[in-house]
Regions:
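Conserved FAD-binding catalytic core of PHBH/FMO-like flavoproteins
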Residues: 151-227, 231
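Glycine-rich FAD pyrophosphate-binding loop
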Residues: 8, 12, 21-44
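Conserved Rossmann-like nucleotide-cofactor binding loop
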Residues: 15, 38, 151
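N-terminal FAD cofactor-binding segment of flavoenzymes
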Residues: 36-73
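FAD/FMN-dependent oxidoreductases across multiple families
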Residues: 119-122, 138, 217-298, 302-306, ...
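C-terminal helical "tail/cap" subdomain of flavin- and related membrane-associated enzymes
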Residues: 296-387
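Conserved N-terminal helical subregion
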Residues: 2-3, 54, 67, 72-157, ...
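Beta1/beta-strand and adjacent pyrophosphate-binding region of the FAD-binding site
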Residues: 1-15
Length: 387
């Protein structure tokens, strides 16, 4: 038997859960599909920036595992500078808990039905709606939000986002002794300059550390070199006793400028749409925002009698892509001038303050570029793709 909904959302990450919540609050009967049983582990550093809380309109401090304001900035696994934070920068979560919390908010609307442990096999979309097939059931809806990640079946079924830049990264969850955990209780670390185009991080969680390395470029470093850097970075940051709980590799997807993320009434959001901030590697904020925009576009289209084309893609291009494109320009500055990217914040509290405001969402890259005058306008000439 085929069941019909106002909307189907595939994926229970931030984009999907937030879209489902917004649709539910608007009174739309929504089906939320997830291929795994919840709660489920999710590959992600788990740093949720302050601007995510702003986008959600809630204080995340009570539900966060840790709230971080201080950053240790490292240069080539040698020199370091501690950047004390006057304001919180990042909330630390395990994604299994954060995503489950967002799903609970969606279910609390009373309009969202969750079916987890149900993998999508195929999707069809036309001007009248969408059909989603799983191994067990077939579902129909007026609209579909594909928020099923970088390798999800929705984009593949629709022929969307098959050509995009994929930035490689690897992370480990590390168990350490109580003394080491205490050292990291209020701070995170970033390493730059050690390997061309790459960076490392340490994010403290409630009972372990998340340690990883990533790369800004799709072709600058072979996988072996990134893996070797990861080993050196781990040994440098955690020289004492430790136990590796989990090691996993992943990629950060970047939407090519102008690439379609919509087919009829089927939309892509979050990582599925390649909405990731290249300079910081942040995806959660953009997932939340795209989920909100997707839901609002659907509600508005319905309110207008479902006439004309759904304008989700135009809204993403107007609201999110300018900042994401500017972030790629800043990432290219790091590729070419890594030393300056360490020295400027390390030596100038004012510059570090500007960076912190970008992370917090109080400023964006365009604002900072304008404040730099003629020097900032040089960024207009930088590439907007990372390949």
């Amino acid at each position: 038997m085929t069941v019909r909904y106002d909307a189907i959302v595939v994926g229970t990450g931030p984009a999907g859960a937030v879209a489902a919540e917004a649709l539910g609050r608007a009174g739309r009967r929504t089906l939320l599909l997830e291929r795994e049983r919840l709660p489920r582990a999710k590959t992600c550093g788990g740093g949720v920036t302050w601007k995510v809380a702003q986008a959600l309109g809630v204080d995340l401090t009570p539900v966060a595992e840790r709230t971080i304001g201080t950053v240790e900035l490292h240069w080539r696994l040698k020199a370091s500078k501690t950047m004390p934070g006057r304001e919180p920068l990042v909330h630390m979560f395990q994604r299994s808990r954060f995503d489950a919390w967002l799903v609970e908010r969606a279910l609390a609307t009373g309009q969202v039905e969750l079916k987890d442990g149900l993998a999508v096999k195929s999707v069809e979309a036309d001007a009248r709606g969408v059909t989603v097939r799983t191994a067990q059931d077939t579902f129909e809806a007026d609209y579909l939000v594909g928020a099923d990640g970088v390798a999800g079946p929705v984009a593949r079924s629709l022929g969307l986002m098959q050509e995009r830049d994929l930035l490689p990264a690897t992370e480990q969850d590390i168990a350490v002794d109580a003394k080491t955990m205490d050292r990291w209780h209020d701070r995170m670390a970033l390493d730059i300059g050690t390997l061309y185009g790459s960076y490392g991080w340490v994010f403290p969680k409630e009972d372990h550390l998340n340690v990883g390395v990533g790369c800004f470029s799709t072709n600058s470093r072979p996988a072996k070199q990134l893996k070797d850097y990861g080993k050196r970075h781990l040994a440098y940051q955690l020289p004492g006793p430790m136990r590796v709980l989990r090691t996993v590799g992943f990629v950060l997807p970047l939407r090519p400028v102008g690439a379609p993320i919509q087919r009829g009434r089927a939309l892509l959001a979050g990582d599925a749409a390649g909405l990731v901030e290249a300079f910081t590697g942040e995806g959660i904020h953009w997932a939340v925002r795209s989920g909100q925009i997707a839901a609002q576009a659907i509600v508005d289209h319905q309110m207008q009698g479902a006439r004309g084309e759904l304008d989700y893609e135009r809204r993403i291009d107007a609201a999110l892509m300018p900042t994401l494109v500017d972030a790629r320009r800043w990432a290219h500055i790091y590729l070419w001038l890594p030393r300056a990217c360490y020295a400027l914040p390390a030596r100038s509290p004012r510059f570090w303050g500007a960076v912190a405001k970008i992370v917090r969402g109080e400023r964006d890259y365009t604002d900072v570029r304008q404040r730099l005058g003629a020097f900032g306008r040089l960024a207009d000439w930088l590439p907007v793709e990372m390949g």
